[in-house]
């Protein structure tokens, strides 16, 4: 193989091509690749930030939901306690009112019983007086007195 001027000219043309490519073609390509790499890195960083923000937001939401659940449970428990207290108070009032009514009814029944006894005593006294009066008006005879006593018993 012989080295001649064509090889030198081709080497010079190649070096000119390399220099031209390094000066005018390679910088825009490298710049485009760097910009693309930067955009990808920025996108990944934004995705990481969004992911961490989402995680923080989820934690805040979970915390607020937990607080809301606790507040709701506390309010329900308080309402249930109030309702139970109202029910107990109503039961106590109803029992007290019932006891008053029973006591009043007993007192009224006792009073009526006393009045009935007094009326019965008065009637017995009247009948006894009538019976004694009739016995004293008639002659003393066992048969007659027995009849009067039977009649007196039926009247009582």
From Swiss-Prot:
GO molecular function, a single term:
proton-transporting ATPase activity, rotational mechanism
Domain of life, source organism: Bacteria
Q: Does the keyword Cell inner membrane apply?
A: yes
Q: How does it sit in the membrane?
A: Single-pass membrane protein
Q: Where in the cell is it found?
A: Cell inner membrane
Give me the Gene Ontology terms describing cellular component: plasma membrane; proton-transporting ATP synthase complex
Entry keywords, A to Z = ATP synthesis, Cell inner membrane, Cell membrane, CF(0), Hydrogen ion transport, Ion transport, Membrane, Transmembrane, Transmembrane helix, Transport
**Bilayer-crossing regions:** 7-27
Q: Which InterPro entries match?
A: ATP_synth_B-like_membr_sf, ATP_synth_b/b'su_bac/chlpt, ATP_synth_F0_bsu_bac, ATP_synthase_B_chain
**Where is this protein primarily located?**
membrane
Read off the SUPFAM superfamilies from this record. F1F0 ATP synthase subunit B, membrane domain
Outline what the protein does.
F(1)F(0) ATP synthase produces ATP from ADP in the presence of a proton or sodium gradient. F-type ATPases consist of two structural domains, F(1) containing the extramembraneous catalytic core and F(0) containing the membrane proton channel, linked together by a central stalk and a peripheral stalk. During catalysis, ATP synthesis in the catalytic domain of F(1) is coupled via a rotary mechanism of the central stalk subunits to proton translocation.
- Assembly state and interactors? F-type ATPases have 2 components, F(1) - the catalytic core - and F(0) - the membrane proton channel. F(1) has five subunits: alpha(3), beta(3), gamma(1), delta(1), epsilon(1). F(0) has three main subunits: a(1), b(2) and c(10-14). The alpha and beta chains form an alternating ring which encloses part of the gamma chain. F(1) is attached to F(0) by a central stalk formed by the gamma and epsilon chains, while a peripheral stalk is formed by the delta and b chains.
| Family recorded in the similarity comment | Belongs to the ATPase B chain family.
Q: What is this protein called?
A: ATP synthase subunit b
């Amino acid at each position: 193989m012989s080295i001649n001027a064509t090889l030198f000219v081709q080497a010079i043309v190649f070096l000119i091509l390399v220099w031209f490519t390094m000066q005018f073609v390679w910088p825009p390509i490298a710049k485009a690749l760097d910009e693309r790499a930067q955009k990808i890195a920025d996108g990944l960083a934004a995705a990481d930030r969004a992911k961490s923000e989402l995680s923080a937001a989820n934690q805040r939401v979970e915390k607020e939901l937990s607080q809301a659940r606790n507040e709701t449970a506390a309010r329900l428990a308080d309402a249930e306690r109030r309702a139970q207290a109202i029910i107990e108070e109503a039961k106590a009032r109803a029992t007290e009112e019932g006891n008053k009514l029973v006591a009043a009814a007993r007192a009224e029944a006792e009073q009526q019983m006393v009045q009935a006894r007094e009326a019965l005593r008065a009637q017995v006294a009247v009948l006894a007086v009538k019976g004694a009066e009739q016995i004293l008006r008639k002659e003393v005879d066992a048969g007659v007195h027995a009849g009067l006593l039977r009649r007196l018993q039926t009247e009582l």
